[in-house]
């Protein structure tokens, strides 16, 4: 199995004028560790930057998400910290993939899936801008899940 190493350079601490907007346009680097340290909410992704028509989001996760499906788009996961399982349901049946730190996985469009983090973990997601975190179809949304298209970094 091949793993993707992710190393983020720290943002310039002396540049108080840096905003999410300028960072999102590629003017300044964004340290993923700083982005993740800027919020505490679980299952509530923050938009780190945009690439063409895609959001690059980070989220802190723990426990179970909910079964959901994105009918028209794949969903890319990269585990930044911790370990995440993704339960999958499709025509072939049900299975679970385990993603240790540094692993990537793409859930194909139309595949029901449910991320699960048995301990605290952090993930990075690539999704088309405006994609709802709970997909197009989903089970009942628990109170701890933020149904959103992503929040701006603080």
Locations of regions flagged by a protein language model:
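Short, conserved beta-strand element in jelly-roll/cupin
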Residues: 60-61, 70-86, 90, 126
